[in-house]
């Protein structure tokens, strides 16, 4: 994205036009954000800024569009109607290193997500997530270890790559260019020639 377009988007979207600008904003208000963090389509994400000192995001974290991260709960607006007492609910959220949070996941307050964790699309994380695991569902539960997931992906990637090529050829009558197969590049290219960019 060129610089002028980026500046206009960030003005229109109040600093949420691109990942770099939004992360800069989060750091400025007090969120602890590590290195190599990408927030995809930040204007579609809802990261609680009410208590920025209660949120930590580690290194190599990828957060996809539609993700919500909450450090507080406003349900006291109902319970205070019972007796006039406001019962605050603020809790820390810690996301450790090498974490992938898929589209439309919700991370609730008082949650710690360990290292090397994948959170599935649409999941609602209400409890801590241990290291080296994949979580999914509502509420999110551990569905397998990261090692099991990695093995499963490696077993299916060739079959999926063939499906991508066949579908593309069927639709267009042409063989796809390499860039269409970016997820499968290491099936047919030397890994040493590439530095994979997220």
Summary of predicted features, one role per range:
Residues 136:
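Catalytic binding pocket for nucleotide-activated donors in carbohydrate/polymer assembly enzymes
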Residues 103-118, 123-127:
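Beta-rich strand-turn-strand
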Residues 30-34, 96-97, 115:
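Intrinsically disordered, low-complexity Ser/Thr/Pro-rich tracts
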């Amino acid at each position: 994205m060129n610089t002028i377009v980026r500046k206009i988007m960030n003005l229109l979207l109040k600093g949420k036009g691109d990942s770099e600008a939004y992360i800069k904003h989060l750091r400025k208000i007090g969120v602890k954000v590590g290195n190599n963090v990408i927030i995809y389509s930040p204007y579609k994400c809802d990261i609680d800024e009410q208590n920025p000192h209660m949120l930590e995001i580690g290194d190599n974290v990828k957060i996809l569009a539609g993700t919500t991260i909450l450090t507080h709960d406003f349900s006291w607006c109902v319970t205070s109607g019972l007796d006039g007492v406001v019962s605050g609910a603020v809790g820390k959220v810690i996301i450790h290193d090498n974490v992938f949070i898929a589209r439309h996941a919700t991370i609730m307050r008082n949650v710690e997500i360990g290292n090397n964790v994948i959170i599935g699309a649409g999941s609602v994380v209400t409890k801590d997530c241990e290291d080296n695991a994949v979580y999914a569902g509502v509420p999110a539960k551990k569905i397998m270890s990261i090692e099991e997931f990695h093995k499963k992906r490696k077993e299916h990637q060739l079959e999926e790559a063939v499906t991508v090529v066949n579908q593309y050829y069927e639709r267009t009558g042409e063989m796809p260019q390499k860039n269409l197969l970016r997820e499968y590049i290491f099936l047919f290219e030397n890994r040493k020639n590439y530095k994979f960019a997220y």
